[in-house]
A protein has these predicted regions:
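Active-site anion-handling motifs in enzyme catalytic cores
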Residues: 1-161
């Protein structure tokens, strides 16, 4: 999928949610990767721009980012960290995969919801993007978080001996 095709698909998704009355927040996680420019382009080309805001994460506003995510009812995550933070916050998430890394983590977590894969452009659509919201699909990752913490405890033990 080209960058232009991705932007157009995200415009359709953003416009779809905006038309349905949702407030849409486009979160830019990494300026260096072009997230902020992409968010601006998506907003500028979307219908009902008044329902769309851009949140620019700059490394100093982590608390505000987490607050925005915790107040959201649904997260469409185009970045690995967005997916993980959304799931950790107990939110319904629609992941957009750009590599197998996210796919494998989702499989390990037992995620069986809908997602898009950029290698399959047809999977990135408004109709697909709203399925997890409509079904209320969420997964509880509490046990995975606790297990991860135990792994770090074991690593600390190993490194300190």
């Amino acid at each position: 999928m080209t960058n232009e095709e991705y932007i157009e698909k995200m415009v359709q998704i953003t416009s779809g949610f905006s038309k349905e009355g949702y407030q849409v927040i486009l979160a830019s996680y990494c300026r260096e990767e072009g997230d902020l420019d992409a968010a601006r382009e998506i907003k500028n080309r979307s219908e009902q721009q008044k329902n769309i805001t851009i949140f620019d994460y700059d490394g100093t506003n982590r608390k505000q980012l987490l607050e925005e995510m915790s107040c959201s009812i649904y997260i469409i995550a185009a970045r690995f960290h967005g997916t993980i933070l959304g799931l950790t916050a107990g939110k319904s998430v629609f992941p957009i995969l750009y590599s197998d890394k996210t796919k494998y983590v989702l499989e390990d977590l037992g995620f069986h919801g809908e997602y898009a894969d950029l290698r399959d452009p047809d999977s990135l659509s408004f109709e697909n993007a709203k399925k997890n919201l409509e079904s209320g699909y969420k997964i509880d990752v509490t046990e995975s978080i606790q297990n991860a913490e135990k792994h770090f405890e074991k690593l600390d033990e190993f490194l300190n001996n």
